[in-house]
Regions:
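Surface-exposed patches in mature extracellular/periplasmic domains of secreted proteins
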Residues: 14-24, 85-90
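Elongated scaffold/linker segments in the mid-to-C-terminal portions of large proteins
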Residues: 74-233
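Generic detector of short alpha-helix boundary/capping microenvironments
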Residues: 23-25, 30, 59, 208, ...
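Extended, hydrophobic/aromatic-rich amphipathic alpha-helical segments that build helical scaffolds
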Residues: 1-12, 27-54, 64-79, 107-109, ...
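Intrinsically disordered, low-complexity Ser/Thr- and acidic-rich flexible linkers and loops
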Residues: 21-23, 54-63
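Amphipathic alpha-helical surface "interface" segments used
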Residues: 22-38, 92-104
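Short, solvent-exposed loop/turn and secondary-structure capping segments
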Residues: 50-58, 117-122
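Residue-level signal for secondary-structure boundary sites
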Residues: 16-18, 52, 115
Length: 249
């Protein structure tokens, strides 16, 4: 698999050079390209390096440091490409990147606007914690019935001070926190995935599915993976790992 990913990275064109059979420019991040191949290569190398001691002893005859180095270099190929860029704010992550086909996306499966054809994104972890106001059939009190939930106080500890992620990832954090605790239970309202398909029957609206692509890899993921690679490589790579983490915080 690693050899095939290396070959793909060699022969596939960059994203901006992709064309269909008629020579038309491709715009979908679901089309395999050089950047996606490097992302795949990085993950394959990292998985094999990190899983060495889970393998049978007879299958451990390889240098994991070499694989961490290969993964780090593949990550760098994606990061240094001018075709991908981090968005500026956490709000853009929610409203653009997680919806799909953004400048930060590296590879994804197109599901937005086609959920009736390719399968509903109902069956995802999001349905276990997303309620009001993403799902119009729910009121704010339903959060207390969820198995997966988080206190607003915990959110503020996770994203302290001026960190705006707490306001992008959770709906009206301050306003809902001020609401009667008999309704909210003191819990926050996840709002990271908010692009949804709604069915309407008469005057009633109901959540049908998430209306977004399946994001396999985005640039922030690649920064995070490179940081992990650099930690395993150690030495003068540690400083670079810290820089990568600070870049995507």
């Amino acid at each position: 698999a690693i050899e095939m990913a290396e070959k793909a990275a060699e022969i596939l064109p960059p994203f901006d050079k992709l064309t269909d059979c008629n020579g038309n420019t491709m715009f979908s991040k679901s089309t395999p390209c050089q950047g996606a191949a490097y992302a795949l290569l990085a993950h394959l190398c990292a998985w094999k390096a990190g899983g060495k001691y889970f393998a049978a002893e007879v299958d451990r005859n390889y240098d994991e440091k070499e694989l961490w180095d290969m993964a780090e270099k593949a990550c760098t190929k994606v990061i240094e490409s001018p075709l991908y860029d981090l968005v500026a704010t956490p709000e853009e992550v929610c409203a653009s990147v997680l919806v799909g086909n953004s400048k930060e996306g590296v590879y994804e499966t197109v599901m937005k606007d086609y959920y009736n054809e390719v399968g509903k994104r109902v069956y995802s972890l999001g349905t276990d914690y997303v309620g009001y106001p993403v799902r119009p059939e729910y009121g704010p009190g339903v959060v207390q019935d969820f198995t997966l939930r988080i206190f607003t106080t915990s959110v503020r500890k996770m994203y302290p001070g001026a960190d705006t992620r707490k306001y992008a990832y959770f709906y009206d954090l301050d306003g809902m926190d001020a609401m009667d605790k008999s309704i909210t239970g003191g819990f926050a309202y996840p709002y990271k995935e908010r692009s949804v398909n709604i069915t309407v029957t008469g005057t009633k609206k109901k959540f049908a599915s998430f209306n977004s692509n399946r994001i396999w890899w985005r640039l922030a993921d690649i920064y995070l993976l490179r940081a992990e690679c650099r930690v395993h490589l150690g030495g003068d790579k540690i400083e670079g790992a810290i820089e990568d983490l600070n870049t995507i915080r």
